[in-house]
Swiss-Prot record:
Pathway: Metabolic intermediate biosynthesis; chorismate biosynthesis; chorismate from D-erythrose 4-phosphate and phosphoenolpyruvate: step 6/7. The active site is at D297. Monomer. Catalyzes the transfer of the enolpyruvyl moiety of phosphoenolpyruvate (PEP) to the 5-hydroxyl of shikimate-3-phosphate (S3P) to produce enolpyruvyl shikimate-3-phosphate and inorganic phosphate. It is an enzyme of class 2 (transferase). 3-phosphoshikimate binds at K26, S27, R31, S170, S171, Q172, D297, N320, K324. This is 3-phosphoshikimate 1-carboxyvinyltransferase. HAMAP family: EPSP_synth. The gene is aroA.
Amino acid sequence: MTRTAKLTIIPPGKPLSGRAMPPGSKSITNRALLLAGLAKGTSRLTGALKSDDTRYMADALRAMGVSIDEPDDTTFVVTGSGRLQPPKAPLFLGNAGTATRFLTAAAALVDGTVVVDGDEHMRKRPIGPLVEAMRTLGIDVTAETGCPPVTVKGTGRFQADRIRIDGGLSSQYVSALLMMAAGGDRPFDIELVGEDIGALGYIDLTTAAMKAFGAKVEKTSPVTWRVEPTGYRAADFIVEPDASAATYLWAAEVLTGGAIDLGVPSDAFSQPDARAYDMIARFPQLPAEIDGSQMQDAVPTLAVLAAFNETPVRFVGIANLRVKECDRIRALSSGLNRIRPGLAREEGDDLIVKSDPALVGKRLPAEIDSFADHRIAMSFALAGLKIDGITILDPDCVGKTFPAYWRTLAALGVTYQDKD
């Protein structure tokens, strides 16, 4: 399939109104897929996301002996034997961070060798802290560059009963270890250490999903979890809509003064990015400082929205954005300054958006490099709702988590000019 090279958003000039359902949560779908694959029996996942990231996870599980059927666009029927099998070839996971981190840890439960690999972007994303944590359990795991590819020689047995890991690193490392732990041979504790504990909400998502599949996991302190070696049992599981995807629709609503029905109230989400709703609702009076540490995937949405705010906004607690699909702090600063020089700047790992409500209605031709990052592409599309001339490069990258994004905006009244 030919990819669209660029897409120019035509400002609608009117409020966006209608019904627009966000897709299923990527974070929850990939957790549920792995847990269902580790379980013995047949699980049915409904409301699931079908996207690049979840297909990489599903295909990897198939390569490890799990049967996965897809009877419709939002359902996975997963049948596992209770133990993953060694794949015959390396697992290729593109640039799917959740799949890569989760399967690296899960590979320790395989009786054999598993190589976890990805594309050129994933090969630049760090995984060393997870590798080091696994080694403390006696697991034979190597990642020569500190990034994928990772080779895991699993046995399903651990030589320690406690892991201490820096809580300021990616929460995906912690989630990966937690999900692995229930399939091990002994109870053990996972403790976060350090001054900055980030994205605890995503760890809560993980433990909730684990419990739904029969695991016994207990939070014994604000930063410690104890996991019993229960394994997992098959379950029917409903995936809630994606809160990160919802942020684009909430922002489109306030930017255009529209009324968009997402089909689910903002307080129905359990995902941490739903916290952004209260911020978005304050537009154009966003706070002077926004801590993005507990809603990291919502920061690009908020940063672009901040460009139209009445006063400047500083984003803090976002250092981990530098090691996402791209350096999102740099990408946001670069893109905003393409729209108007001086609109944003980096200060250490903070992002400062100076804000300029006068941007609304102007023609400011700007090609925005998405850096093949779905969240950069979707966020800067919001700028195109109010500024004439915004062009997104590599718009098809939204297929990573929200394949219908451009169609969803079109159904609300947005039009485009594309160029292959």
